[in-house]
Amino acid sequence: LLRTEYSISTLIKAGVSTEKLASAAANWQRGQAGIRMRQWLREFGDAIEVVFANNDDMALGAIDACTEAGLGKSSLPFIVGVDATPPAMEALREGTLEGTVRNDAVGLAESLISMAVSLSSEGTPPQGMEVTDGSYVWLRYEAVTAEQPEG
């Protein structure tokens, strides 16, 4: 997914050495992510340093698996998610989730409506809306951490 791709490319551009140990789909589900993480913990153990989850439920599933495996807060991999859901915000406060990303839901809705109206009436994207590769419109995201809970 683009979220993971851009997260990893940002680390590489910053000079962080990376090694991808594993990747799998968990269909945005906490339970499925927990199953995958349990498998990886058996396979890779403490070699897992970072988990990029493409939504908060999957990040929480990874945390569940780590907790079940007996990992304390200080032993957890660096786990991040996306969406800034209430359960993820609680995990941030507890110190089990390192960060999440808040989507701009209002901006997304406004962009979708603007795009739909413009495409249906004019056949082109709205003026001023930048479209990448003919398919993508980039929206604002906010990093959320325990130190910056408001993003």
Regions found by a protein language model. Give the residues of each.
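Hinge/cleft segment of the Venus flytrap/periplasmic-binding protein
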Residues: 9-14, 107-151
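Short beta-strand elements at the ligand-binding edges of bilobed clamshell
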Residues: 23, 94-106
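Conserved functional loop/turn residues at catalytic and ligand-binding sites
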Residues: 15, 44, 96
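Class I S-adenosyl-L-methionine
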Residues: 5-15, 63, 67, 93, ...
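Hydrophobic alpha-helical segments within soluble ligand-binding/sensing domains
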Residues: 2-9, 31-36, 59, 84-88, ...
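Hydrophobic alpha-helical
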Residues: 7, 21-22, 26-89
